[in-house]
Amino acid sequence: FDDADIDAAIEGALASKYRNAGQTCVCANRFLVQDGIYDEFAATLAEATASFTLGDGAREGVTMGPLINETAANDVLAFIEDAVAKGASVAAGGARSDLGSCFIEPTVLTNVSKDMRVFSEEIFGPVAPLFRFGSEEEAIAMANDTEFGLACYFYSRDVGRVWRVGEGLEYGIVGINEGIISNEMAPFGGVKESGQGREGSKYGLDDYLEIKYMCMGGIDR
């Protein structure tokens, strides 16, 4: 949102989007950026991704590795090509690295729209499409316009907005001013097509328990 700490939001974006080259189930898929900070956020994120060093993750200094296989890399490129063909601009990356067929450059897309695959499908790669929004209500509607519902993140310094948006988002996990959300003490799980039940925390025990109901009568005899 416009009132977010942009530096913190950029740090969270890098963590939630590009870790493991975008291949975790809680990686951010779409970025919704309010009009007032859209250009600044896009430029800053694009500049930040340029600092990544691609390569073998076991080597010192490498900050982003390859995708799991060439098929996955080709799928990610197809997302980028679809977006560009429909009017998106590439602010950073956007191509296969010369390191090999499984390496995709960390990518930032601007001027994206709902008719692009990056809006409705899981990218599972290092691509951040930046969608514009005007109002809080529009942001919530856009965020919920998906069949998935595992994790989401948002940045705002308005306490009232934090509660309104947090409650309005249809996701099992909501990161508020945080890009890393998982730990063993927190319930992990989603809604809609992102599954049922929870792992972690005391709620994660529920799937391993059986409830016994005992109906008693005549205990005074």
What residues fall within each predicted segment?
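Conserved C-terminal structural/oligomerization subdomain of aldehyde/semialdehyde dehydrogenase
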Residues: 14, 53-54, 80, 96, ...
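ALDH superfamily catalytic-core signature
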Residues: 1-113, 176, 220
